[in-house]
Each structure stands twice: as structure tokens, then as C-alpha cells.
């Protein structure tokens, strides 16, 4: 959300200490919840930017044209902003193709955003440059492990720490097919210093893990936080949680092992699913036959991959139930089709849009 503090014709609102010149909110398709005062509300594509993304971003740039040192831009930023806030420096179709390639490559979010920054007129600190000399006060909800401010939503209002050399290495590592125009963009450095920006982090995966731990305790489980920086392959994370489950089968207490972060998926098939669903299904293979043992994993925003599910839930009987239907977990994972397998055994988790995004959480439950 971008708000400009002054007067904006008939859309004027009261703002303590000044006047609201105008504002715009950009969210995912289907996530708008009605009007917010006089702010413009726009829905756009995610995880791949679409024409609505580009149009909404143009409106935000127009709103912040011609600012002075007396103006302040209140910039509310969260995960998903890389897709929702975009003014490409390459043809739109190529940007969409590169984004899809990165999403399928197994690249982590830092690697993806390093490339995205250099293909954009608003990422990597360039939006703050556009707003200058106005002050940009950025309030950030972090969805990246370690809270790197230049990487969250690709850092529209923060100095960029990545380099052209980083971008070249990532493009080569993942075999990105780039036009000469896109290749030239990778050679253009992003702003390394911005003196008109102030930033505040208001939430992250640490708060998510703390809240999940408290909920587990209320349900009678003793919470054990394994990590709040989970960043491996989804299948590896599922196998790890299964190993933890087997190592603690002799416990006399009900335990909840939690892991927060964001895994990745390297697409090898043409199925449907998301990283949390794939993590859960991988865990199902490892906990097969264990009684009173379950694993669930979900995205805090209520969306896991290009599906309507937030994640997945499995227990010690999931593998057998799928086998009775002729479904083999290994084959499903190879085809990246966790969604349909979990749907077949009632293992999909649906929360709907939560209105926040602070990574994912996976939980192993052992009940005694």
C-alpha cells in the first residue's frame, strides 16, 4: 500500500499531522475486502505479474510523481510484492516468462529477487528513488528468513546489497534464457545508498513460530522449536521431520516439533501442488505406520503454490490409505502432484486468505 501525505482533490482524508493526498492498495486477485476510505483498491497477479499488476503499479507511480521534500510516502510492504508491484524494464511477456522459469527452477527467494530487481523500474530501491526528495516511511511484514530488507518484495524502498555479478551467476546457474535487452539490465547496478528512507519491520516468521508454539501448548503439547530458518527442499524437510518423529517414538509426553521458514520445490513433473503440500506428503512416507503421529505444513497467507489450499496434513496412516487407492507417494512427488494425492485422502488444509504473510510453518505432532 502506498499513501501520499498531502491533498488529493475529492479523495482527501484526515491524517494526523498532515493531509492524505491519496493512496493505493495492491493485493492478489480475490483478496480485496472492500473499500478503505478513499484509497484506490487494485487486485493483481501472483506469483506471476499480470497486466493488472502493471496497470496498478503505473497508478502508484503516477500518484507519487512530482513529490517534494515536504511530502511523506507511507509504504506498507509484505511478501508477494515482487509480483504485485512491478514496472518492467523488459517486455512484459519476457518478464512473465523469466518469473515462471525462476519459480520452477528451485531457486530460493533471495536468488529470484536478485534477478527481479534488475528487470524492474521499482524494485531494488528504485521506487524510493522515484519518490525522492520525499521521505519514504516503509513498514514491512517480512516473509524472508533473516529479514533482509533489500529482498522482501524485492526491496522497492531499500538500498540493494546484491550486485550485477550475483545476478549473472544466478542467471547462469539456473540456465535462464534472456534476451539481449534483459542481459543488459543485469549489468545495470541498483541504488546502494538511499537517504530518504526509514524502515520498520512489524512482523516475521519468529512471531509465527511463537504463536504456533503457544497454540500447541494450549492443546496439551510441549512445543520444541527446531528452527525458524528452514530453507531446504520441501521433500528434504518432510523427510527430516519424519526422522525426528521416529527418533522420539518412546517419548512419554505429547510433543510438537515446529519448523518455520520457506522451503523450495524443484519442478520435475507437471502436477499440481505447493511446497507445503509436498513437504507434508514427503513426511507421510517417513511416518508410515507410526501411531498418534502427524505432520502438517501450511503457508501463513493461506495459499500454497497455485492452489486453493494453504498446505497439507498427514499421519501415520496416510501412505496406506493412498496405497489402497493405487497412489504411490514416490511417483506423486516425482510428478509434483501432491495436491491431488492429499485431496484423495482428505489431507488438504484450507484456511482462506489470512491477510498476512510471514513464511510457512511445519509442525510434527506426537500425542501421548
Cite the ranges covered by each PLM segment.
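Conserved small/polar residues in nucleotide/adenosyl-binding loops
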Residues: 1-5
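Glycine-rich oxoanion-binding loops at beta->alpha junctions
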Residues: 26-70, 111, 115-116
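Active-site segments that bind and position negatively charged phosphate/pyrophosphate groups
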Residues: 220-297, 305-306
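Accessory alpha-helical/coil subdomains and C-terminal extensions
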Residues: 134-137, 159-240, 244, 249
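Glycine-rich, mobile lid/loop segments that gate access to catalytic sites or pores
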Residues: 62-151, 156-159, 334-337, 341, ...
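Internal helix-turn-beta structural module
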Residues: 281-368
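Gly/Ser/Thr-rich active-site loops/lids in small-molecule metabolic enzymes
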Residues: 88-109, 160-175, 269-295
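A glycine- and small-aliphatic-rich helix-loop capping segment at beta-alpha/alpha-beta transitions
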Residues: 10-19, 38-40, 61, 88-101, ...
Amino acid at each position: 500500500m502506498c499513501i501520499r501525505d498531502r491533498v488529493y482533490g475529492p479523495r482527501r482524508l484526515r491524517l494526523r499531522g498532515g493531509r492524505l493526498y491519496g493512496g493505493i492498495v495492491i493485493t492478489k486477485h480475490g483478496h480485496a475486502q472492500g473499500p478503505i476510505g478513499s484509497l484506490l483498491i487494485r487486485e493483481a497477479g501472483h506469483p506471476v505479474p499480470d497486466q493488472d499488476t502493471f496497470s496498478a503499479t503505473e497508478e502508484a507511480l503516477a500518484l507519487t510523481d512530482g513529490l517534494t521534500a515536504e511530502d511523506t510516502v507511507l509504504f506498507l510492504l509484505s511478501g508477494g510484492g515482487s509480483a504485485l508491484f512491478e514496472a518492467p524494464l523488459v517486455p512484459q511477456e519476457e518478464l512473465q516468462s523469466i518469473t515462471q522459469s525462476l519459480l520452477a527452477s528451485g531457486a530460493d527467494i533471495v536468488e529470484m529477487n536478485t534477478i527481479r530487481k534488475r528487470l524492474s523500474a521499482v524494485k531494488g530501491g528504485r521506487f524510493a528513488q522515484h519518490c525522492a526528495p520525499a521521505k519514504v516511511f516503509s513498514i514491512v511484514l517480512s516473509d524472508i528468513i533473516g529479514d533482509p530488507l533489500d529482498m522482501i518484495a524485492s526491496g522497492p524502498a531499500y538500498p540493494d546489497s546484491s550486485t550485477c555479478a550475483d545476478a549473472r551467476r544466478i542467471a547462469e546457474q539456473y540456465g535462464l534464457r534472456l534476451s539481449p535487452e534483459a542481459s543488459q539490465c543485469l549489468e545495470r547496478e541498483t541504488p546502494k545508498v538511499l537517504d530518504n528512507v526509514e524502515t520498520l519491520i512489524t512482523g516475521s516468521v519468529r512471531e509465527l513460530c511463537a504463536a504456533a508454539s503457544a497454540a500447541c501448548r494450549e492443546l496439551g503439547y510441549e512445543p520444541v522449536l527446531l528452527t525458524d530458518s528452514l530453507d531446504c527442499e520441501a521433500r528434504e524437510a518432510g523427510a527430516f521431520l519424519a526422522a525426528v518423529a521416529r527418533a522420539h517414538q518412546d517419548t512419554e509426553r505429547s510433543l510438537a516439533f515446529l519448523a518455520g521458514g520457506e522451503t523450495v520445490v524443484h519442478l520435475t513433473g507437471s502436477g499440481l501442488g505447493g511446497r507445503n503440500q509436498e513437504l507434508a506428503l514427503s513426511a507421510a512416507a517417513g511416518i508410515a505406520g507410526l501411531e498418534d503421529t502427524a505432520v502438517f505444513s501450511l503457508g501463513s497467507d493461506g495459499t500454497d503454490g497455485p492452489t486453493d489450499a494453504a498446505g497439507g496434513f498427514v499421519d501415520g496412516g496416510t501412505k496406506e490409505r493412498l496405497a489402497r487407492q493405487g497412489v504411490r507417494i514416490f511417483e506423486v512427488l516425482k510428478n509434483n502432484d501432491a495436491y491431488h494425492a492429499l485431496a484423495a485422502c482428505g489431507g488438504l488444509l484450507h484456511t482462506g486468505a489470512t491477510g498476512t504473510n510471514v513464511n510457512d510453518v511445519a509442525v510434527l505432532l506426537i500425542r501421548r
